[in-house]
Design a protein with these regions (language model features):
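Conserved anion/nucleotide-ligand pocket segment
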Residues: 124-152
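ATP-dependent carboxylate activation and anion-phosphoryl transfer catalytic cores
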Residues: 213-284
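Conserved N-proximal alpha/beta basic substrate-recognition cap immediately N-terminal to
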Residues: 2, 9-111
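Structural motif
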Residues: 51-53, 129, 165
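Rossmann-like NAD(P)H-binding beta-loop-alpha module
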Residues: 101-128
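Phosphate-binding site of ATP-dependent enzymes
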Residues: 142-229, 242, 250
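Glycine-rich phosphate/pyrophosphate-binding beta-alpha loops
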Residues: 56, 138, 197-199, 255-265
Length: 284
């Protein structure tokens, strides 16, 4: 049976990972088809596994996407698993990981329609970053300068109905960017250095880097925490981190849903994801 590599009908940018993954599956003698998640003509039961890749329009179709996860879970195997996908949809997962001992960027969750003491947050952190708790890419992610309380309130209000995360603007992100560590089957594969990205901006990746021992330790502890929450080991993960004020890496995001994996920077890395997908099937 073939493998489905799931994307969306209108990509905001090409997904270079898809042809590389197809070629890697083909070398294993496995057919991999690129399909659109909300194509009503697709019979998902004919696939041995459905691997979520560039479903980057799910934010605008959240209810339908959640129902799609339920539908596919009933008839075949999702990669990552349905419980992992559901958990990773909302960035409150950061608070779950913090409770499990993972060092995250300080994060305040503002529920839709809720209030927050903006003056206290500005006093504690200085400049802030506001981002929707359910988002893809840099959608509605902005930085707000110290004292710009009115701008913060208006930004959240203008996206009414959405939960928001409020985080400090790390100087290291502005000056040096962040490290994205790609992991397959719970093991680090490769890492890239990426610049800060705000709403409306293109991604600014700067090529492969060697993650530090501290960054690798953070990635390992993060994935161990996911397993400790009863979610199992993700077939693919991207651990996004940056240096905190004391130099220690902090988790910015854990991408388990539809992360870019930057396989165009290291095409051979696709074999590790293919192996994880096929090994997961063999263990069933």
């Amino acid at each position: 049976m073939p493998i489905a590599l799931v994307t969306c009908i209108e990509l905001p940018r090409p997904d270079p990972d898809l042809p590389i993954l197809r070629e890697s599956f083909a070398r294993r003698g496995v057919s991999a088809e690129v399909v659109v998640w909300n194509d009503p003509t697709i019979d998902w039961s004919r696939f041995d596994a459905v691997v979520v890749r560039s479903t980057w329009d799910y934010v605008a179709n959240l209810g339908a996407f959640a129902r799609w996860i339920d539908e596919v879970e009933r008839v075949t195997r999702l990669v990552n698993s349905a419980p992992i996908l559901r958990w990773n949809l909302h960035k409150r997962y950061l608070l779950d990981l913090s409770s499990s001992g993972v060092d995250i960027i300080p994060t305040t969750l503002v529920p839709a329609g809720g209030t927050v003491d903006w003056a206290a947050l500005f006093a504690r952190h200085g400049d802030l970053v506001l981002k929707p708790a359910i988002s893809a890419g840099s959608f509605a992610t902005v930085r707000v300068g110290r004292g710009e309380e009115a701008a913060a309130v208006e930004h959240v209000r203008s996206h009414g109905g959405r939960d928001f995360l409020v985080q400090p603007l790390l100087r290291s992100v502005v000056e040096h960017g962040e490290t994205n560590i790609v992991c397959f089957g719970g093991r680090p594969s490769h890492a890239i250095h990426k610049g800060a990205r705000w709403s409306g901006q293109a991604e600014q990746s700067r090529g492969l880097v060697a993650p530090t021992a501290a960054e690798l330790d953070l990635a390992a502890r993060t994935l161990a925490a996911v397993e400790g929450l009863g979610l199992g080991v993700p077939a693919y993960a991207r651990v996004d981190c940056a240096a905190g004020p004391d130099g220690r890496p902090l988790l910015m995001e854990l991408e388990l849903l539809e992360p870019a994996l930057f396989l165009d920077r290291l095409p051979s890395a696709a074999d590790a994801l293919v192996a994880a997908v096929l090994a997961d099937h063999a263990s069933e």
